[in-house]
A protein has these predicted regions:
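Two-component/phosphorelay signaling modules centered on CheY-like receiver
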Residues: 17-36
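Acidic, metal-coordinating helix/loop segments flanking the phosphotransfer/catalytic sites
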Residues: 37-55
Length: 153
């Protein structure tokens, strides 16, 4: 069961400081989210492992570690593999979107986007993630109870 007092944490990674603050402020005002920001991919990776967010919103084009590389790093780590990743990018070509999904994105959104639309997508991917987490826990409990039952006798 999810703790009703838990405020989901969203990590927003974008090298455009003005846009980063606008997104963070919109998420704080429109939804019950705790928001953490990072201004490049390397800092995003570092912040991810500091706060273990419930969702990560990622720009693609950033200096150094870009959004695709950040997603691949997160998907390659067992602790972050199931965290929802949402790309927020101005790159609108189908090949860009395909590259995003192949890198591990759960959603690919185009800039500019309205704040309410962004909140809706984040809420949806966090909800999906919670459902999947509960399913995994139930399956594990089922396996454990079968093991306990098999040892008796």
């Amino acid at each position: 069961m999810t703790d009703p007092s838990h405020r989901p944490t969203v990590l927003v990674v974008d090298d455009n400081e003005d846009l980063l603050e606008l997104i963070a402020e919109s998420l704080r005002k429109l939804a019950p989210y705790s928001v953490v920001t990072a201004s490049d991919g390397a800092q995003g990776l570092e912040r991810y492992f500091e706060v273990h967010p419930d969702c990560v919103v990622i720009d693609v084009k950033m200096p150094g570690l870009d959004g695709y590389q950040l997603m691949k790093a997160l998907r390659g780590d067992a602790n972050s593999r199931s965290t929802p990743l949402v790309i927020l990018s101005a790159m609108a070509q189908p090949k860009d979107q395909l590259a995003g999904f192949l890198s591990g994105a759960d959603e690919y959104l185009l800039k500019p986007i309205g704040p309410l639309e962004l909140v809706k997508v984040i809420a949806t991917v966090i909800g999906r993630s919670e459902v999947e987490r509960c399913r995994r826990q139930q399956a594990l409990l089922g396996e454990l109870s079968q093991q306990d039952g098999g040892d008796e006798g």
